[in-house]
């Protein structure tokens, strides 16, 4: 049996392992990050950048393994994400904590595979994001999110007649929907309407909503991002349609949309591995540190990135890699180490990884109440 190394974040510092690898002053691994800092998905990139910086500062303060971190904007665009990757390579990147969203992550994953660069995406959930042996993820995959959502709805008897509105042009959205539909049948749920939109037509959802309403949908499943979700909630309210709404991690950020009446988000449920209102010391310390440094409450994407940085630290310590090694040699050692560590993180206790890049962790459900995310699993 492989020996397991267990770490927790500095938010639970009393249990932190001390690095067994010696690092001279000035020696540091260069970790790059890529994600949207501008555009419709910017809240995700900003959260990942902030939380990674927070983790890096904490880790460096310990005096053991050291990291430098640089983050590049990709505007949630695949081509720009590859350009950002090349910019980070020019900087001297040795590992990538990214990218943030799925389509850009797939494009960049092809580049990291060619370079044999270690890649850990905090939130790229499409299956293809970790198709290569050098790539791992912190978040749940799209199929896992889809199946878990159907299971949660069915097991908690939230509804039996389900409407779905999804983006058929987006790998994240369509991937979740496909697995949701499969598991819904196993749960005895009836999908009474399943209506798609595309990236070229994502402002008017009246047709999709009307079909769900006419079909008697009691709950509308939204495996989409928060910007489109805010429009759907607004338009549903205008037409007097008030079903339950349930989504996945893409809805995280809904309360930050400019001009959106957040009262319309009351009661919205989403499946996520992180709830900022959790009362464990690790979460409370992280939320307090994040709010002090950046203002605002951290979303799941921030927690994913924070856990990801500590996973990289654990794998570095386990593998014994040093900053003077080649990118390829670092990657080979990190691949093995990732399957031998256990991380007690914000998004899961006892988190481990399989050789296929997938994490082993438990989902949680949260509900928006009075403008905040409240755990439904307390």
Describe the predicted segments one by one:
Residues 2-4, 23-378:
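Extracytosolic ligand-binding ectodomains
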Residues 4-11:
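Alpha-helical transmembrane segments
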Residues 12, 16-17:
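Hydrophobic core
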């Amino acid at each position: 049996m492989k020996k397991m190394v267990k770490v927790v974040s500095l938010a639970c510092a009393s249990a932190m392992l001390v690095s067994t690898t010696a690092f001279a002053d000035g020696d540091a691994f260069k970790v790059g990050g890529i994600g949207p800092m501008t555009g419709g998905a910017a809240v995700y990139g900003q959260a990942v950048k902030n939380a990674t910086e927070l983790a890096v500062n904490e880790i460096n303060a310990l005096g053991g393994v050291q990291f430098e971190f640089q983050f590049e904007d990709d505007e949630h665009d695949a081509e720009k994400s590859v350009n950002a990757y090349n910019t980070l390579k020019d900087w001297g990147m040795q590992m990538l904590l990214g990218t943030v969203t799925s389509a850009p992550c797939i494009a960049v994953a092809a580049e990291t595979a060619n370079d044999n660069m270690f890649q850990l995406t905090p939130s790229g959930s499409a299956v293809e994001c970790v198709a290569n042996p050098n790539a791992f993820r912190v978040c749940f995959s799209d199929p896992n999110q889809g199946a878990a959502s159907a299971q949660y709805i069915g097991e908690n008897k939230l509804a039996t007649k389900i409407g779905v509105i999804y983006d058929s042009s987006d790998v994240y959205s369509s991937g979740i929907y496909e697995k949701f539909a499969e598991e819904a049948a196993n749960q005895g749920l009836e999908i009474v309407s399943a209506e798609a939109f595309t990236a070229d037509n994502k402002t008017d959802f009246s047709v999709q909503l009307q079909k769900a309403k006419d079909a008697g949908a009691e709950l509308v499943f939204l495996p989409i991002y928060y910007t489109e979700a805010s429009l759907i909630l607004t338009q549903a309210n205008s037409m007097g349609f008030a079903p339950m709404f349930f989504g996945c991690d893409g809805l995280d950020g809904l309360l930050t949309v400019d001009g959106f009446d957040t009262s319309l988000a009351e009661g919205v449920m989403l499946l996520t591995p992180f709830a900022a209102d959790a009362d464990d010391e690790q979460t409370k310390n992280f939320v307090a540190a994040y709010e002090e440094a950046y203002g605002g409450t951290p979303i799941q994407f921030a927690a994913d990135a924070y856990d990801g940085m500590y996973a990289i630290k654990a794998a570095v310590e386990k593998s014994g890699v040093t900053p003077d090694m080649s990118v390829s040699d670092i990657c080979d050692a990190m691949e093995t180490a990732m399957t031998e560590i256990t991380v007690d993180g914000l998004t899961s206790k006892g988190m481990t990884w399989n050789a296929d890049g997938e994490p082993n962790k438990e989902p949680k459900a949260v509900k928006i109440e009075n403008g905040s995310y409240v755990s439904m699993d307390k």
